[in-house]
Amino acid sequence: MKIKALSKLKPEQGIWMTEVDKPEVGHNDILIKIKKTAICGTDVHIYNWDEWSQKTIPVPMVVGHEYVGEVVAIGQEVRGFEIGDRVSGEGHITCGHCRNCRGGRTHLCRNTIGVGVNREGAFAEYLVIPAFNAFKIPDEISDDLASIFDPFGNAVHTALSFDLVGEDVLITGAGPIGIMAAAVAKHVGARHVVITDVNEYRLELARKMGVTRAVNVAEEKLEDVMAELGMTEGFDVGLEMSGNPAAFNSMLTTMNHGGRIALLGIPPSDMGIDWNQVIFKGLVIKGIYGREMFETWYKMASLIQSGLDLSPIITHHYKIDDFQEGFDVMRSGMSGKVILDWE
């Protein structure tokens, strides 16, 4: 049987609607009928066919890894899932036999394979993934929110890396993940949550999500904002979401001594920084990749159930046949999360 899917068909700019074979369910897998998918920054890189994509993405391949759907078939070894369960899923498929997997640090598996990056993805009518990777969505969480659990998980993993209660938090990069991380920081009890960017559309989104200050660094100095907030000693926690060298260096300069930084943004490989800031301030820097399995997922559900409102971050909806409009608006930078409806 053939199904509709969005695929990277050619090694050039673009993504194409295609027909592919319906995937087969293995012993340990579940088959998910996709309801909604969201477009990730990674999908935009794949669309643009940038240097990273050219090195990483096999062609042809079905793309996408942010989704929600319904379980419609179950492999014979699978326990804990039933037909009709509403699920999203962890996009990092791990090996299960390396030291980190066996030691319970699954998110640090050295043999990780990415759904829609190294193997067939979720932008299709059906997706097969290992049942281990699926996560049941509580009834009170909407399909829209469930479809963005993957990037929300990046935000939660980064934000909750360090204690935030009563702390002053700087977030560099107001993309959707940065904005969600800011909302989490505020929700769990940070004092001042300041986010920086140069994209006024996204800074306005951050304001809607309740940050203390959203700062356009092209127009005002971070140091002036800190003075205005009565901050005399610098930020306690930094969440770097942009991969922008100037943003990271500005973070290092404005951190308090003993400050802690979680790094999710991917900088150019040869980024230079002022190491004196790190050493003489005694800063701690932690690299973040993916989500903790599955601690981050349970935290995500609990945060929403405890009143965290992410709805402003979802700005655009399109039917799947209009996917091109969705990619165009994502590439323009004038959007939050963009959702594609498969039903």
From Swiss-Prot:
Q: Which GO terms describe its molecular function?
A: L-threonine 3-dehydrogenase activity; zinc ion binding
Question: Biological process (GO) annotations?
Answer: L-threonine catabolic process to glycine
Q: What's in the keyword line of the UniProt record?
A: Cytoplasm, Metal-binding, NAD, Oxidoreductase, Zinc
Q: Which residues bind Zn(2+) 1?
A: 40, 65-66
GO cellular component terms, alphabetically, are: cytoplasm
The subcellular localization recorded is: Cytoplasm
Q: Which family does it belong to?
A: Belongs to the zinc-containing alcohol dehydrogenase family.
Function according to Swiss-Prot or TrEMBL: Catalyzes the NAD(+)-dependent oxidation of L-threonine to 2-amino-3-ketobutyrate.
Q: How does it assemble?
A: Homotetramer.
Protein name as it appears in the record: L-threonine 3-dehydrogenase
State the species of origin. Answer: Vibrio parahaemolyticus serotype O3:K6 (strain RIMD 2210633)
